[in-house]
């Protein structure tokens, strides 16, 4: 059974890696200084971080809509895929996974939606995705790849070590006193 792999734009792949691994991406939207961009489509990571560094406020993101995922899943079904493994940013960080689950219930293709909860986002999810793509290319079934993805995601750790606490202060995650004490 051939299956597709779908991620959101928090997965830490370049455009070249998406293409080489045959991974399909549904972008989140980012809002910076009043402008909205489709993440990794209309703005690169480098452009995002540059604009964030020069912004007075903190950028915001919004999840893809269920319709965005429904379009992706229907397109994959039309292309002949019989199933999909979709791995997304942790549900505690974003509503992206709920949009994906809602869409999965509306389409005529077997979609397995996985929460990158322990992985959080980015590189940890990318490592799991790369492994299941390798399995897919070697003939693994959807069930086998799903089991491996769950195993890898359960082992993942997500740590953050920011160079500066400025954005945590701007976003209200830390108080001025906490930032001062951490310095």
Regions picked out by a protein language model, each given a short descriptive name:
Residues 83-90, 112-115, 131:
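Short glycine-rich or small-residue beta-strand-to-loop segments that form or flank ligand, phosphate
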Residues 4-68:
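N-terminal glycine-rich anion-binding loop in soluble enzyme alpha/beta folds
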Residues 4, 10-24, 28-31, 96-106, ...:
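Mixed-charge interfacial surface used for oligomerization/domain docking
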Residues 36, 57, 88, 116-120, ...:
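Conserved short-loop catalytic and cofactor-binding motifs
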Residues 40, 61-65, 88, 124, ...:
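Catalytic cores of large soluble enzymes that bind and process phosphate-bearing ligands
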Residues 64-100, 104:
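Active-site cofactor/cluster-binding pocket
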């Amino acid at each position: 059974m051939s299956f597709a792999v779908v991620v959101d734009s928090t997965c830490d792949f370049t455009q070249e890696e998406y293409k080489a691994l045959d991974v399909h991406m549904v972008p989140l939207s980012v809002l910076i200084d009043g402008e909205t961009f489709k993440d990794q489509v209309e703005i690169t990571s480098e452009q995002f971080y540059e604009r964030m560094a020069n912004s007075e406020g903190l950028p915001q993101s919004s999840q893809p809509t269920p319709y965005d995922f429904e379009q992706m899943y229907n397109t994959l079904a039309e292309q002949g895929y019989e199933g999909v493994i979709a791995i997304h940013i942790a549900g505690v960080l974003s509503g992206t996974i709920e949009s994906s689950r809602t869409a999965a219930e509306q389409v005529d293709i077997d979609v397995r939606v996985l929460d990158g909860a322990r992985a959080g986002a980015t590189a940890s999810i990318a490592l799991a995705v790369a492994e299941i793509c390798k399995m897919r290319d070697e003939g693994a079934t959807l069930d086998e790849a799903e089991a491996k993805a769950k195993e890898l995601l359960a082992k993942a750790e997500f740590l953050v070590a920011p160079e500066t606490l400025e954005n945590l202060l701007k976003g209200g995650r830390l108080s001025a006193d906490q930032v001062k004490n951490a310095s």
